[in-house]
Amino acid sequence: MNSKLRHLLLIVFSIFPILTWGTENLSTADSIRISLLTCAPGEEIYSLFGHTAIRYEEPARGIDRVYNYGLFSFNTPNFILRFALGKTDYQLGVEDYRRFAAEYEYFGRSVWQQTLNLTAEEQRQLITLLEKNYRPENRIYRYNFFYDNCATRPRDKVEESLQKSGSQLLFSNAH
């Protein structure tokens, strides 16, 4: 084998580990998927308008969870009256996606998934915000039909994560 070719191969194989170093983190970031879950309405008063949650998937780490702002206690005294008056406390819960989907399947309610087109930094910001919001001191909120509910909370967290990343929420009228 030619001496120059040997030196060239030695250089290439010496540099190769440096070039591939760090690609594990890149592939993990690329494999993260964050989606909005839109759930069909149910027949109970608390499910008449459907539901929205956020799904976070990171297969490389075995993560497939749902951030669900629609949890409440059936044991709340006068629940239906308090719900109708907008005086019900709801909270953020985190659960495995399979369990979340199984509940909707059991009740014959569809779930649609819309994957969000987020950069790695926007994803990181959103997960950080959701985890901060899931702390015991932050998870409970006063439900409001129009301004503070399971649909507005995910929207607000996505918008906040975009702002923290220096981006903004854009809507397209294209059909």
Where are these regions (language model features)?
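Bacterial Sec-dependent N-terminal signal peptides
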Residues: 1-25
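Residue-level marker of positions within ordered structural domains that often coincide
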Residues: 22, 58-59, 131, 159
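Short, flexible segments with low predicted structural confidence
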Residues: 25, 97-98, 125-127
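Glycine-rich catalytic cores of cysteine/serine-nucleophile enzymes that process amide/ester linkages
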Residues: 29-109
